């Protein structure tokens, strides 16, 4: 029989830099999970993605064991890296703060495709394009 899931914890952590300090410690500690075991496993799994924020979904079971799934970095992080800027515009309707090419947009869409609720690369590109537009980043040919 399968183990019963007690809790699902969602966190967004720097790749390869998880430590027992907040937010990781308190979130896992209240469910009795071995915090250091999670940190070591997460850091090992994400060390090749250094510099990105990687969302993680942790399933905690009745016997206090856990499994976790890492997701792809948020689209906004990928877009700001591609555009070479710190952050998006606070007022996207008043002008752009940077731009990305169609090829960069396609690359980001391919990266995000497993986590998006679409099947084709074209629809994924439209989703990412909308995110970029809301951040004040224009798309060039």
Swiss-Prot record:
GO biological process terms, semicolon-separated: translation
Pfam families: Ribosomal_L11, Ribosomal_L11_N
SMART domains, sorted: RL11
PROSITE patterns: RIBOSOMAL_L11 (PS00359)
Single GO MF descriptor: large ribosomal subunit rRNA binding
Keyword line: Methylation, Ribonucleoprotein, Ribosomal protein, RNA-binding, rRNA-binding
Modification(s) after translation: One or more lysine residues are methylated.
UniProt xrefs under InterPro entries: Ribosomal_uL11 (IPR000911), Ribosomal_uL11_bac-typ (IPR006519), Ribosomal_uL11_C (IPR020783), Ribosomal_uL11_C_sf (IPR036769), Ribosomal_uL11_CS (IPR020785), Ribosomal_uL11_N (IPR020784), Ribosomal_uL11_N_sf (IPR036796)
Gene Ontology CC entries for this record: cytosolic large ribosomal subunit
This protein's record includes keyword Ribosomal protein: yes
CDD domains linked: Ribosomal_L11
Known partners and oligomeric status: Part of the ribosomal stalk of the 50S ribosomal subunit. Interacts with L10 and the large rRNA to form the base of the stalk. L10 forms an elongated spine to which L12 dimers bind in a sequential fashion forming a multimeric L10(L12)X complex.
Family stated for the protein in its record: Belongs to the universal ribosomal protein uL11 family.
PANTHER family xref list: 60S RIBOSOMAL PROTEIN L12, LARGE RIBOSOMAL SUBUNIT PROTEIN UL11M
Role summary: Forms part of the ribosomal stalk which helps the ribosome interact with GTP-bound translation factors.
Protein's recorded name: Large ribosomal subunit protein uL11
